[in-house]
Amino acid sequence: MSYVTSNDEQKVEIVNIASLEGRVKERMEAQGNKGAFGYIRGGAEDEWTMRENTASFNTKTISPRVLRGIDSANLSTNIFGIKLKTPIIQAPVAAQGLAHMEGEVDTAKAMEEVGSLFSISTYGSTSVEDAAAAVNGAPQFFQLYMSKDDQFNQFLLEKAVKSGVKAIILTADSTLGGYREEDVINHFQFPLPMPNLAAFSGSDGVGKGVFEIYAEAKQGLVLSDIQKIKNWTNLPVIVKGIQDPVDAMEAIAAGADGIWVSNHGGRQLDGGPASFTVLPRIAQVVNKRVPIIFDSGVRRGEHVFKALASGADLVAIGRPVLYGLNLGGKEGVKSVFEHLNKELSITMQLAGAKDIEAIKDTDLL
């Protein structure tokens, strides 16, 4: 199965992040990659939750402060002692080779250059070792889709630890694939190998659909899996896919070192609440005991600001990364982050928040 996609390496002119989707759709469909674009863009069932993720940011307004002597904005922050130049990070996204020939390698390089954080998926088009080798010791996280086979889990995690990752992301909201009609219509099957899978079993995922890939995942995840991963790796474990305050409390009690508030960009359960809707309640019960990462629906610097003001410590983006990757490779991904950083900086100064801590003290109405 041959697959050819973008190999462009260039800065991308961006007016707003949402406009990138149409540009990428046109390019990928012209290349005969309609199914791949549908996989990247699509959401579950009626895509209500996917749309609500972005729309929900308009349910809150920023209460700006003035006359505070703020002539610049400081975006720097940190997590687990890792210093970052921006609170915006890349969400782990599978199969980035669908968007660009260099896939995760270009994304990892971009994250290093903008001072952000790269996370690689179990289902990446690049191995965890190759992604780590692409950068000069820049911090990376590994996203684990836990398998039914603990030998496979330990094998993968050992690879990740040897590659120098700084934390493990346990994906809790994706024990099977959401019903995405676009994938069904396009008869989408993965055209590129997934090296992390192939290294253990020889089965690289080529020619398989989403449901076949997820069939090997552990459907019956339990809280004790958190400690199991910590014992295997001696690394912090972030639980990704938390949408309920009780789950957040139970995950922390079970040893979680971080909470990732996410509904997988509306790709899994349709009809569930927007991530931004549930964030304040989760932040309240977490009460700063562990860091909170937030994603789903972020398309503006204003959205980043509102998520931080609602209790998030970092804000992740998924689809926009792949759109930038398709349009310009490493430089395209950098363009996405530079644009969002610019919007966030403007919002901060106009709202009267000089740094990330000041954003957290800002009232939303």
Question: Which residue stretches match the model-derived regions?
Answer:
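C-terminal helical cap(s) of enzyme catalytic domains, especially alpha/beta-barrels
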Residues: 53, 271-284, 325-345
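Glycine-rich active-site/cofactor-binding loop and its immediate structural neighborhood
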Residues: 84-126
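An N-cap/entry alpha-helix motif that binds or orients negatively charged groups
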Residues: 2-81, 180, 188-221, 357-359
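Short, basic, glycine/proline-bearing loop/turn elements
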Residues: 89-95, 138-145, 210-212
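Charged C-terminal helix
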Residues: 342-365
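Alpha/beta enzyme core
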Residues: 95, 109, 134, 150-294, ...
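Short beta->alpha linker loops
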Residues: 44-45, 122-126, 148, 243, ...
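A gly/proline- and charged-residue-enriched helix-loop-helix capping module
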Residues: 113-153
